[in-house]
Amino acid sequence: LEKEQQSTRKLKHLLILLSRLLALTALIFAFAQPQSKNGEGQRSGKPALLIYLDNSFSMTAIGTEGTLLSEGRELAKRMLQTVSPATRVLICSNALNHVEQRFQTKAEALRYLDQIESYALTRTLDDVLSWQQRQIKKHQELKEKLGQIKQVFISDFQQSQARLEQQKPEANQSFFAYQLKAQQNQNAYIDSIWFAKPTHHINTDQMLMVRVQNFGTQAKKRLELNIKIGQIKRTMFMQIDAGAEQIASFPYKEINNGSVLCQAHINDQQIHFDDTWYFSYEVPDQTNIYLIEEANSSPNVAKAFAVEERYKVWKTLPGQVSSTALAETDLIVLNGLDEIPSGLREDLITAHQNGQRILIIPGEDITFNDYNPLLRELSLCELGAPQANALNLQRINDADPFFSGVFEKKQQKWNVPMVKKAYSVLNATNSSATPLLIARSGQALFMRSNTTAFLWTTALQPSFGSMVNQSLFPTILLRCAEFASQRYPNYAILGKDAQIKVRASHSNEAPLRFISAETEFIVQYVGTPNNLRLQIGGTAALERLKAGLYELKGIETLAQIALNYNRIESQLKLLSKSELIDLLESNGIKNCNFNQIKEGQSLTAIVLKESNSYWRL
């Protein structure tokens, strides 16, 4: 009996132990998510190799065996030599265009790798993975089933690429990351340029600012910076601490006229795509002003513009406005109108959308239902009933670019009586308009919306005060006209800006082209009267256009356009192995092999074996 009881207890203990082992095994399997080669996870079909070769500008950094891009190209070729002839190959770069959507033979893939050059657009990991998944799905739906799928990513893996949404790879997909590292993680580059004054006129003083960044751990003791502004050339040498920036200033007197082609250039040894910043501007011969006023409007507006010959003023009544004249003008001024006819209001909105600047000076008894719809469209504050309390000028927003170069020193608080009455501002807190003259009550007496629309909140008639007798009044009117003379931006950025707005007329008789010494490109555009929206965000533009200065030409030259590369990869901040693996695993990619290449790709063994995921403790 005792032996039977011992046997029973022993069997009971064994059963308990077995059940615990089975439970533990189940837990391990649940967390590990194992992949079976003989079950549902294994598919029959042709093997596939997908290679992403990062060709963004950071890959132009110098590695042990040339640029990182050339090393990556050779690494991809070596991978292709290891696969069987039956393997379906898909090569993609940052272009992700229609050419790269097709699976190729090994021979075709090798030829295509030689065609991949630097590209102005960067891609995130999510961009590439999602695009590859779509191509895999489409190929299997339209062509054939795929067996084992290996996806290879060759890149320096910038932190700017570190965006990834949740992925759901199939069991037959495995992933391989090859990180190429430059010899030096150093880069000096031109970050941006700007002018002390936002407008340009012949024989006036101007100052160019150039900001240079020094990324890395080594100081720059004698970095050469060369400046060319039309006929003006300057050189200086900069000292920049490691990880610091410096702003160089170049004062000059404007001796150029018409279109002015410019560039700033540094001599850096590591990466070169960001060593030059191109820009352009116009010194106009004439600015056209269209003055819409009533018979009783203040004559002081026209007198203010008459002090300089370059301002050509055309006057008209509200009922006689020409749409053609509106389209051809630089600055439209509404002077003292009480009513704005609906047709004129629509023409003004269209003109503003086409790039014309608008200055509004209200009449002394305005119809708010005429004014406020227009003000809303121009992103200006709406006006309410006149008020007369605390309207002494207290502050000038002299830090705003509108007043750049106007005052020699910072303006202190004022308490100057300028007007007796002003229209109240109804929606100041919800408006994006910028107040430039502020009364003691906090109300804006003058404001702007960007640099395209300007509004006085007081009328010029004597019942509202003596604004026309203040020295600020003609100064502000002339500054509005100066802003109106700019027809196109100083520069645009490839890979960031989708379009460039140019105020110019173009006939469809000839194609619209970007022309430089190296290339000629027919540009896509959307045209309205005296306004062109040039499309530079498409695949064709990004593949053909390089950073530089371009003549915009139809039948005749319309503008000089400066294009620059995006500086998003100028700071060489790389993902570490743990950061990359954690990013992938947290978003569903749990079987990625990581390889880092520091001493040249030719010394790196190519091992594209399946990798299984394990439960990470």
Report residues per predicted region.
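VWA/integrin I-like adhesion module and closely mimicked acidic/polar interface patches used
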Residues: F157-P198, K220
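Acidic, S/T/G-rich, low-cysteine, solvent-exposed domains in lumenal/extracellular/periplasmic regions
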Residues: Q159-Q173, A177, N296-R487, K546, ...
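Membrane-embedded catalytic interface detector for glycan/lipid assembly enzymes
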Residues: R448-T451, T457-F464, N469-L617
